[in-house]
């Protein structure tokens, strides 16, 4: 399962810094932020899975995963960006928080693997559910999408000429 982590992180980072990533980073900032809103319903589904005993509780917002904040605030921050009312400091802060929360859940997921078992070795505390279909799409697709989204927004916000510049609604 640890082998899933390398492509989950390396591929979206490589794509984010490629020519295609340059094109994608040129999308309106509001779109780049809004793309992270999928994390809100995802966290609700994960909470339900934990309530049903299908995944470890530490990987939900009732445990140690507060990634739901990124999904919920993406909607508000994207709307502010679309209206031209999201100051650059807000976008930088939001992306830093979202990136940090993503790193936290990645650490929790790895620490919950059977080989590590940092949260205990009881079956309910072990992260084995992502090895089964359709849950394998969580690390393979959705985590990669979240990583790519943050890389693209960082690239956009830190590109030359954008520093210190106010963002117009469609910039």
For the regions a protein language model found, what residue spans apply to each?
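C-terminal ends of transmembrane alpha-helices
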Residues: 40-53, 104-121
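Alpha-helical transmembrane segments and their helix-start/interface "positive-inside/aromatic belt" motifs
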Residues: 88-96, 153
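Hydrophobic alpha-helical membrane-insertion segments
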Residues: 93-108
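Membrane-proximal helix-loop-helix units in multi-pass membrane proteins
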Residues: 20-87
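Cytoplasmic-side transmembrane-helix entry/capping segments in multi-pass membrane proteins
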Residues: 1-4, 26-36, 92-95
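Membrane-interface capping segments at transmembrane-helix boundaries
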Residues: 16-23, 153-168
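Short, membrane-exposed interhelical loops at transmembrane-helix boundaries
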Residues: 116-136
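Hydrophobic cores of alpha-helical transmembrane segments in multi-pass inner/ER membrane proteins
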Residues: 3-18, 69-78, 137-155
């Amino acid at each position: 399962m640890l082998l899933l982590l390398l492509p989950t992180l390396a591929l979206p980072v490589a794509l984010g810094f490629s020519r295609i990533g340059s094109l994608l980073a040129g999308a309106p900032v509001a779109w780049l932020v809004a793309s992270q809103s999928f994390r809100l319903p995802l966290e609700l589904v994960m909470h339900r899975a934990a309530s049903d005993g299908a995944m470890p509780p530490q990987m939900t917002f009732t445990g140690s995963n507060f990634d739901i904040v990124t999904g919920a605030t993406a909607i508000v921050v994207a709307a502010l960006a679309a209206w031209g009312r999201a100051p650059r400091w807000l976008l930088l802060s939001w992306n830093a928080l979202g990136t940090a929360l993503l790193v936290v859940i990645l650490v929790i997921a790895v620490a919950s693997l059977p080989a590590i078992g940092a949260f205990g070795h009881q079956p309910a505390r072990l992260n084995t559910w992502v090895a089964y279909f359709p849950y394998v799409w969580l690390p393979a697709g959705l985590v990669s999408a979240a990583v790519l989204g943050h890389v693209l927004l960082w690239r956009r916000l830190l590109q030359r000429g954008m520093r210190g510049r106010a963002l117009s609604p469609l910039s």
